[in-house]
């Protein structure tokens, strides 16, 4: 099923566990959406340090509890990039009016609206057909995923934007979790820790040659420069302002301070 449907099933207890895009989980637990704010991390190393920080994880777990979820870790879908069938995207204005498939989550919808695109939420399994039938002009997924899922067969323009890092929280139904022994719970947590390490390593390998593979398919690939990223970051300021109000100053400021602090460490 789609992510939203699976999350509803975990909440209801018909599914015991799922890994879900933070943006989709934010429909149930708004505060976790902060993980996927656009252009918020300067680089992947900083992002991992923040997301693996014990205080950050404890807070995420606390936000999930009242909604019937137990947070035990993440899976990862890498930094996201953009592909489309119309033209290269090098600046926010290039997104004007483009119908872009987005994750069914508020941060994604608001990000692309703010950048001038026409965000179209669709479940992941429907992307290829929607691109092929020109229901949408483009989509955002890691370039590695776009090559793997053959989106680059129908979208010949790609931009390595690294705009949103998709770490997918692994959530377990609270009732099911309570039925487990402490030893069983420990096994679940340990498995989640091994899984994210393997996941991140695999993504790094896959991403390393994604540009080369896309170019071999005659895809026009543009990589945002640091200057380009700054222009995009300024353009999404209204998204930060809106979600600071939703998450509350305390959680937002705490998270941003963690990013600042870790970005200064070598």
Regions found by a protein language model. Give the residues of each.
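N-terminal secretory/targeting leader peptides
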Residues: 1-46, 55, 62-266
